[in-house]
Amino acid sequence: MRVDPIHTKEKSILSKKAVLGTLAAAIALAYGGGTWLAGSKVKSSYEAALDEVPKQTALVRVVERSYERGFFGAVSTVTLELGCAADAALQVPAVKPAAEKDQEEEEETATPFKAVRITFRDTIRHGPFAGGTLAAATIDSELVFDVKGQAKAEQIFGKAKPLTAHTKMAFDGAYTTDLAVAPAGLAEEGKARFAWQGAQLRIETNGARTHVRYDLTMPGLDVGDARTGATLKMGKLTSKADMDKSAGWILATGKTEARLDSLEFAAPKGLGGAAGGEGKAVPAVLLQDIDIVAEATIADGLYASTGTFKGTGKIGDTKIDKFEMSSGGRRIHAAGYKKLADAWMQSSAANGCGKGGGKASQAAMKVLFDQLAPDLKAMAKYSPEIGLDRMLVEIGGKRGEISYTAGMAGVTDEDLQAPGMALLMKRGVLKASARLPMQWLEQIAATGAESGQTPPPEMMAGLVAQGEEKGFVKREGDDVTAQIEYAEGSLKLNGKPLGAPGQ
């Protein structure tokens, strides 16, 4: 049989076109399906995140939210209310008749500050190729103002957008956000000035939202008060963190590091407290090369955290060669701590909300404390401890140190049946110590003697000798030291029971 080559070639071309057409349709269908699935995933992520907001604190609420979804993208608009809710009224205790009210009581019945509302708008582009990149979605965020709010924003930020953020969302739900706050400035002639160089922040979160990393940079801040001449200047601040928040933000673990180039405060005319004139000048304070490190862990259900703050500086004409402060908490029962912290954060009373002011807030907080007291007592079984582990200052080759820790030790189930104060007196533990150079005490006395607040410096050696004779302090070379310890219901001063000979 004779085969027509032309007809065969036409059939081949048609077959290839059909295959290509089918392939193109499949790709289009797959892309469309991927886009639709990406859009669904983004929307569900938004809903989950917004549902979590009111669970964090009583001071933040989602009051308006809309999500206009299209095929290739969506627009989300969310309004948050910051501050006390309008319906957060507290039970007000009985008050005196109007004739007996004084000014202080009238101030206590003042209502809380009006809440502030902030609106964010997110422009979302669905994947799988969102905004020219392979991602489930990209999101561009900005603040939204009404006419009045826009005018105020322009006074501070100029024509720049106050806040912008670009987020790339991965297919597993992880996201990376680059956020920028524009430089801001405000100056009122004869009053105050404010100049901030803005901030940049990158946040990375995994799909389960349990692991967070961030990097923050703030170039600087300059604030001044023309009336008092007071100024506050902050140099460049950088910070980074790597945290696990699978147990919630309250129990986030990991490490945070920060460095502040400088922090300077000066008040040459005082702080404005003196009536009818300038106040007494406050010595200028300059802190430099400040390093901050914080770490937190959870092991065997117990939470521990430490924080260290150190650097160099100058107060007036006195150079500080080194300062360091370390504090922390240990053996904090994680579940109990979270329950207490969540209840506190969710309490309108604890956040100062509701009518009735201070008295009503105190009454409501007492009710809250009574409810949480059993949980607080139960945490004592784990021998919790908090304190200032070390505060050290070096000046002119001399070093001063103070420290203290407070906690509970040896608590039994039987102990927990006792009232809270009885438990504290029996099982509470307190340790504190101080070491100061004698030279510093003499310098402090010389400064205070000018205003008659302290004895003259030449009397200081005699006063220290009297204190040593009575057992209140010890002399160790050029230093004066003191130690106090409370445990098992007894108090010791410098290693001796209080009331013993020499005390």
Language model segments and positions:
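Gram-negative bacterial Sec-dependent N-terminal signal peptides
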Residues: M1-G34
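Glycine-rich, small/hydroxylated-residue low-complexity segments
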Residues: L20-T22, L29-Q503
